[in-house]
Amino acid sequence: MHAASRESMTELATTLDNTVAQSNAAVDGAQIGPELFDVVEVLDSNRDLRVALIDPAASSEKRADLADRVFGEKLNQASRSVLRSAVDKDWSNTRDFRNGLVQLGRRALFRAAEADDKLTTVESELFQLARVLEDAPQLEMLLADRQASADRRRQLLASVLYGKVTSITETLALQAISRAKQRPVEACETLSREAAQLRGYEVAHVVTAGELSDTQRSTLADKLGRIYGHKMSIHGEVDPSILGGMVIRVGDERIDGSTSGKLEKLRRAFA
C-alpha cells in the first residue's frame, strides 16, 4: 500500500477494534467480516463504483451516502459504520481501497475468534490447511484455476472443509481463494501469520522428522524469541524424510539443521 492508504488502514484498524469492542465482539465481528467480503465482491465487478467511493473530488458525506444507497440494506449497523469510515478516508488508488476492506474483514473475523477464545485455533487450522493443500497439488491447482468461477472454487473448498474447521477459518479460507493473488497454500499461510501477529507473535515454520512435544515447542519458542526479539508461534510440520534435526523458517530466513541437510552437504563436499 502507498503512504496515504497505509495511514488510512492504521486508523481504520483502530476504528474496527473500537466498534467490535463496544458490542458483542464474537457476534459482530463474525458478521462484519463476511459482509465486508460481500462488499468487495460487488466492488470487484464494478470499477465505476470503486472509483466513485474514493473520489477525492466528492465530499466524504457524498461518498458515504453512495455507500449507504448501494450497500445499506445489505449490511448490519456495525458493518455500515465501518464501511462509512472507510470511504471517509484517503486512498491512493482503488486497489488499496479494495484490499483495505479485505484486511478489515479479516481483522473483524480474527477479533471474533479472539473474543471466543479461538484465535490460536484459527491460526493453527489455517496453517494445517496450507499443509493439506501443499500435499494435494491437484486440489490446489483446481482452487487456483482462474477459468473456474469463484463460486465453483469456493464450493470445492467448502466441501473439503465441511465439519473439519471452525466457521471463521472456513470463511477466511473461502474468501482468500475466491480472488487470490497468491497460491492457495501461500494465501492460507498469510492468513495464519496475520492471526499470529494479531496476538503479538511472529511465526516460525518448523519441520521435524517426528512430532514435537509441548515441552520441546515451548523451549524452541523461547530460544527463537531470544534470537529474533519477538514472541514466537511455532507452526510445526512433520516430514520423516529429513531423518532428524529440524528445518526452521522465519520470514525469508531458512535454517537447515536437518540430518538430511547435513548429509547432503557432506555429499557435495566429497563430490
Swiss-Prot record:
One of its GO terms (molecular function) is proton-transporting ATP synthase activity, rotational mechanism. Pfam families: OSCP. The keyword Transferase does not apply. The keyword Metal-binding does not apply. It is found in: Cell membrane. PROSITE patterns: ATPASE_DELTA. It is a peripheral membrane protein. GO terms for cellular component: plasma membrane; proton-transporting ATP synthase complex. Keywords: ATP synthesis, Cell membrane, CF(1), Hydrogen ion transport, Ion transport, Membrane, Transport. It comes from the Bacteria. F-type ATPases have 2 components, F(1) - the catalytic core - and F(0) - the membrane proton channel. F(1) has five subunits: alpha(3), beta(3), gamma(1), delta(1), epsilon(1). F(0) has three main subunits: a(1), b(2) and c(10-14). The alpha and beta chains form an alternating ring which encloses part of the gamma chain. F(1) is attached to F(0) by a central stalk formed by the gamma and epsilon chains, while a peripheral stalk is formed by the delta and b chains. Belongs to the ATPase delta chain family. F(1)F(0) ATP synthase produces ATP from ADP in the presence of a proton or sodium gradient. F-type ATPases consist of two structural domains, F(1) containing the extramembraneous catalytic core and F(0) containing the membrane proton channel, linked together by a central stalk and a peripheral stalk. During catalysis, ATP synthesis in the catalytic domain of F(1) is coupled via a rotary mechanism of the central stalk subunits to proton translocation. HAMAP family: ATP_synth_delta_bact (MF_01416). This is ATP synthase subunit delta. It comes from Corynebacterium kroppenstedtii (strain DSM 44385 / JCM 11950 / CIP 105744 / CCUG 35717). The gene is atpH.
